[in-house]
A protein has these predicted regions:
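Short, hydrophobic/aromatic-rich segments at coil-to-beta transitions
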Residues: 1-7, 35-39, 93-103
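Secretory pathway targeting signatures of secreted, lumenal, and periplasmic proteins
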Residues: 4, 12-68, 109
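Short, acidic/polar N-cap/turn motifs at the starts of alpha helices
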Residues: 4-8, 13, 87-89, 116
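Acidic/histidine-enriched, beta-strand-rich ligand/metal-binding domains
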Residues: 5-8, 102, 113, 138, ...
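Short, isolated positions in well-ordered beta-strands
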Residues: 16, 97-99, 126
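Surface-exposed amphipathic alpha-helical segments
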Residues: 22, 126-154
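Short, solvent-exposed aromatic-acidic interface loops
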Residues: 57-60, 76, 131-135
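Signature of long, low-cysteine stretches enriched in small and polar/charged residues
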Residues: 70-121
Length: 154
């Protein structure tokens, strides 16, 4: 099996290596509460539905990764009427910490996974979110493995 050539992207305090044929769009943005954040939007080659969207910035005051994942779920999906013990947000071992997220198919029937994790650098708490999309959920695992192996924070 041949080794895939990687390229390094550095933006907003995140460094990551991805396949060199993939497309990257970066953006800085300000949340309504004034936090400055960075977004890295990565797409595979045309015709390949795999994508990774990373957001990274200071943790919102009074929040944590679980609250952020839950809020995102209910913002995107809404209240399904499920019982509390059927909470769709689950734990992930991600980036050496506990992340929280959920899986949901897209309108195009692609697999989609969203994870929030709290990462710390220089004694500060940061919110790291990752949205991955692929043809199958098994491909999502490969994308998450790639990120975990190739990411670093500044």
């Amino acid at each position: 099996m041949s080794k895939i050539a990687l390229k390094k992207i550095e933006f907003g305090g995140v460094a990551l290596q991805i396949p060199e044929v993939w497309t990257v769009v970066t953006e800085s943005y300000t949340e309504p509460d004034g936090r400055e954040c960075a977004m890295i939007d990565i797409s595979a080659e045309e015709g390949d539905p795999r994508s990774i969207v990373i957001s990274y910035g200071p943790m919102p005051e009074g929040s944590d990764a679980f609250m952020e994942a839950s809020d995102t779920y209910y913002e995107l999906i809404g209240d399904t009427g499920a019982e509390a013990e059927d909470d769709p947000v689950c734990e992930y071992d991600f980036l050496g910490t506990v992340g929280f997220g959920f899986e949901v198919p897209t309108e195009d029937n692609l697999a989609c996974n969203f994870i929030c994790a709290e990462v710390g650098t220089e004694g500060r708490s940061y919110l790291f979110t990752i949205l991955t999309t692929a043809k199958e959920f098994e491909d999502i695992d490969d994308l998450l493995d790639l990120v975990e192996q190739e990411i670093s924070f500044k």
